[in-house]
């Protein structure tokens, strides 16, 4: 027998019937055993109907035993009697008549009643229950159950049982006031009503980006139908939202899906008052279409064209283009309605309308300023999502954050609970070691602490009830910061001091470049104070000048001062992009090429860390096409990668370093320490470098840069400071080996003298330290002349470096 359509409870009833037959020692399963199985199952509609008729398990069992008695012999196999088989067939027929796609316990009981001649029917009659009365009881329970379980509470539900089991009735949910209010979408809802009122092809499809409120428009229509704010033609319509996943789920055999969908369509056609809403309309394409079977879209096409089926679809622009537009026959049956992202003002109104729901859920109050901040900050900083969805999510998470914060146990209560646990453990230990006096004393302490805990907890909860937690602008800003990594919360005093002293912080790393340090510090302050142009990067700079004067070092120092770690800087070495074909690696390989799925080396890094210092080192080494890519980054703070995603550069500091003009300077000997007039020297050098820059880069590229900074040549006084910095780095490395080092002024001057080079800036100093300090120390360490815990002094005697060691003083 086929039990595939039987519900779990119905299958349980048949299993219980078999158990009853075995218990009573009968060789066959008859109608009486099925009746016993129905009453023993206890939870289905059939069991409830029998209980309502006053028929309990014991009552029926006694009557069955008195009618047919107990058997003696047990056979190996047990079969259904012809009457029992007929009952199961009739139960399937009853399910079909009621329009149900399943066979439940109620259908089995109706089959028993309809059979009318078996032992079960005699049992019911003997217990004073007429078959007609039993049938009425089942149908009554079945009707109330359908009304309660389906979304709608209207009389038309009986006409659409399959649809009710697969779809949600939005009009019924709207009637219960369970839908969120729909604000500012009257124009789109009006367009939907106009299309629905057409004679044929009355199927609107809502097309828009994810999160702009497409589903909300269908909910808005349901609310208008309930409020009688629609034309006569749409009065008393039911908006049912159908999930294609539910329709496909459980269709194990070929033809089941088509049968289910045809039933839904027949019910809609017969009811005549159903508007079907299919969210994610593109799921129609291919749904249920395996191995030559036709899919859902092809089954629906004829009804959609003739106007027999009113359907509202919703899908994104990308999915519409990818799936619907490819099928011209399906596309012509739908009328597209564009749903645009609401403006900032409209989004604020939407959030104000939703405020009550979120306040009730989180038990907090949300200020007007918080709503405004949620919309404006999400619009500015969360660029890869759409309003109002992203602003609603901000409010939701901020509400959750504030609510959880008020539930945190205060520290004094935690401390008391900890003490109470310790005293309990001590008391138990004292009892076990039979120190009863100590245990009695500890018991008194425990009692006192328990009272303190209860009092503290009570006062905390009372205070909690009186406090009305509030979601403020700061809470919204904190959530934005946690999402994006961009600091938008109110500036703390410690950060204020840091921002005001940024020049000093940078000067401690970069020596002799006042102009560059001041320009960068000003850009950071401008951004953090909220005064920068919101449509452009925080700052874009070109650092020019001879090699070894601190161009890259300043970018590293800036990253460390802002993020606390110079490794958080995004560094792209432009010498890797010298060939024309390599430029595409910045934004990602085009389709069909290796690396398409990996994303761009620049765009992916900025997507992951939108608030960062981006260093494009040695920019003049790159292919000229790279500068064309950078034009829109510099002007609009955005760049589109190979997959069409827009990457936001508005919270980055863009630094490009270049050695343009260095060769010209070398020829003219402008770099050095022998020129008397330093100001004139720098001015001449700047003019030369700017001339070279204009020849190397196109005007539209140079014109978009915020500031072009020409680094000064290093002076002799700077070299000693740089030696001190480099020796500090050596000190850190030696500290790991439990050693400390000190360079005397004479040693520093000697290193500076050895590392002076008129053309190469500070890098020769690094080589001088390697040669005269690090090499000497490594030899002494290997010889065993320097031991752990010693303090090393590097000095100069008779023009030579000498290493002295002493015991380290703490």
From Swiss-Prot:
It comes from the Bacteria. Gene3D superfamilies: 1.10.8.60, Clp, N-terminal domain, P-loop containing nucleotide triphosphate hydrolases, UVR domain. Coiled coil: none annotated. Residues 6-71 are annotated as: Repeat 1. Residues 3-144 form the Clp R domain. Residues 417-452 form the UVR domain. GO terms for molecular function: ATP binding; ATP hydrolysis activity. SMART domains: AAA (SM00382), ClpB_D2-small (SM01086). It holds the Pfam family AAA_lid_9. Keywords: ATP-binding, Chaperone, Competence, Nucleotide-binding, Repeat, Repressor, Transcription, Transcription regulation. SUPFAM superfamilies: Double Clp-N motif, P-loop containing nucleoside triphosphate hydrolases. Residues 471-662 are annotated as: II. InterPro entries: AAA+_ATPase, ATPase_AAA_core, Clp_ATPase_C, Clp_N_dom_sf, Clp_R_dom, ClpA/B, ClpA/B_CS1, ClpA/B_CS2. GO terms for biological process: establishment of competence for transformation. Residues 80-144 are annotated as: Repeat 2. Residues 163-410 are annotated as: I. ATP binds at residues 208-215, 545-552. PANTHER family: ATP-DEPENDENT CLP PROTEASE, HEAT SHOCK PROTEIN 104. Belongs to the ClpA/ClpB family. ClpC subfamily. Competence gene repressor; required for cell growth at high temperature. Negative regulator of comK expression. May interact with MecA to negatively regulate comK. This is Negative regulator of genetic competence ClpC/MecB. The lineage of its organism: Bacteria, Bacillati, Bacillota, Bacilli, Bacillales.
């Amino acid at each position: 027998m086929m039990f595939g359509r039987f519900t779990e409870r119905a299958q349980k009833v048949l299993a219980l019937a078999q158990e009853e037959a075995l218990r009573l020692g009968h060789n066959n399963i008859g109608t009486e055993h099925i009746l016993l199985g129905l009453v023993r199952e206890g939870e289905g509609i059939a069991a409830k109907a029998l209980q309502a008729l006053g028929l309990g398990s014991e009552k029926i069992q006694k009557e069955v035993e008195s009618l047919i008695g107990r058997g003696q012999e047990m056979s190996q196999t047990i079969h259904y009697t012809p009457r029992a088989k007929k009952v199961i067939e009739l139960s399937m027929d009853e399910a079909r008549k009621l329009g149900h796609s399943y066979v439940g316990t109620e259908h089995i009981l109706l089959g028993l009643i309809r059979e009318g001649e078996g032992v079960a029917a005699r049992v019911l009659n003997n217990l004073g229950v007429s078959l007609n009365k039993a049938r009425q009881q089942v149908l009554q329970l079945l009707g109330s159950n359908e009304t309660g379980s389906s979304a709608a509470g209207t009389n038309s539900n009986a006409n659409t049982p399959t649809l009710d089991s697969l779809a949600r009735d939005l009009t019924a949910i709207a009637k219960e006031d369970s839908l969120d209010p729909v604000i500012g979408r009257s124009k789109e809802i009006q367009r939907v009503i106009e299309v629905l009122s057409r004679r044929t092809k009355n199927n609107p499809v809502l097309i828009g980006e994810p999160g702009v409120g497409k589903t909300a428009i269908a909910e808005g229509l349901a609310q208008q139908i309930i409020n009688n704010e629609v034309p006569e033609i749409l009065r008393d319509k039911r908006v049912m939202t159908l999930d294609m996943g539910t329709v496909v789920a459980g269709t194990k055999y070929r033809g089941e899906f088509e049968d289910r969908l045809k039933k839904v369509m027949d019910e809609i056609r017969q009811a005549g008052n159903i508007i079907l809403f299919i969210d994610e309309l593109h799921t129609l394409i291919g749904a249920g279409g395996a191995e030559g079977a036709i899919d859902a879209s092809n089954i629906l096409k004829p009804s959609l064209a003739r106007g027999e089926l009113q359907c509202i679809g919703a899908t994104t622009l990308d999915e519409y283009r990818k799936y619907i537009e490819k099928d011209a026959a399906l596309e012509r049956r739908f009328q597209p309605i564009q749903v645009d992202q609401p403006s900032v003002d409209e989004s604020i109104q939407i959030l104000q309308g939703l405020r009550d729901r979120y306040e009730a859920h989180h038990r907090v109050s949300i200020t007007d300023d918080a709503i405004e901040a949620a919309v404006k900050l999400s619009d500015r900083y969360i660029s890869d999502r759409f309003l109002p969805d992203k602003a609603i999510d901000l409010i939701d998470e901020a509400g959750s954050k504030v609510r959880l914060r008020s539930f945190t146990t205060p520290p004094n209560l935690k401390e008391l609970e900890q003490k109470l646990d310790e005293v309990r453990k001590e008391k138990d230990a004292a009892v076990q070691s039979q120190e009863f006096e100590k245990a009695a004393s500890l018991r008194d302490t425990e009692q006192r602490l328990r009272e303190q805990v209860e009092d503290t907890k009570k006062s905390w909860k009372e205070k909690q009830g009186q406090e009305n937690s509030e979601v403020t602008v700061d809470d919204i800003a904190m959530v934005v910061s946690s999402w994006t990594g961009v600091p938008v919360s109110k500036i703390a005093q410690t950060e204020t001091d840091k921002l005001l002293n940024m020049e000093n912080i940078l000067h401690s790393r970069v020596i002799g470049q006042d102009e560059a340090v001041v320009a960068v510090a000003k850009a950071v302050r401008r951004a953090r104070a909220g005064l920068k142009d919101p449509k452009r990067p925080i700052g874009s700079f070109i650092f020019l000048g001879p090699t070894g004067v601190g161009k890259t070092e300043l970018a590293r120092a800036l990253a460390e001062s802002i993020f606390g770690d110079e490794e958080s800087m995004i560094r792209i070495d432009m010498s890797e992009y010298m060939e024309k074909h390599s430029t595409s690696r910045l934004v990602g390989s085009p389709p069909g090429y290796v690396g398409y799925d990996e994303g761009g080396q620049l765009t992916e890094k900025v997507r992951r860390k939108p608030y960062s210092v981006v260093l494009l080192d040695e920019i003049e080494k790159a292919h000229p096409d790279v500068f064309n890519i950078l034009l829109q980054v510099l002007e609009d703070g955005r760049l589109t990668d190979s997959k069409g995603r827009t990457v936001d550069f508005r919270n980055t500091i863009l630094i490009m370093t270049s050695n343009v003009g260095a060769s010209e300077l070398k020829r003219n000997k402008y770099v050095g320490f022998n020129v008397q007039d330093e100001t004139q020297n720098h001015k001449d050098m700047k003019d030369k470098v700017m001339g070279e820059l204009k020849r190397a880069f196109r005007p539209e590229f140079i014109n978009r840069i915020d500031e072009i900074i020409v680094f000064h040549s290093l002076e002799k006084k700077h070299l000693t400071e740089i030696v001190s910095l480099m020796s500090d780095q050596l000190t850190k490395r030696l500290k790991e080996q439990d050693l400390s080092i000190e360079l005397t002024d004479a040693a520093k001057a000697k290193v500076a003298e050895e590392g002076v080079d008129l053309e190469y800036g500070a890098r020769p100093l690094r080589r001088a330290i390697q040669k005269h300090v690090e090499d000497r120390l490594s030899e002494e360490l290997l010889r065993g002349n320097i031991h752990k815990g010693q303090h090393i002094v590097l000095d100069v005697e008779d023009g030579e470096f000498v290493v002295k060691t002493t015991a380290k003083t703490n």
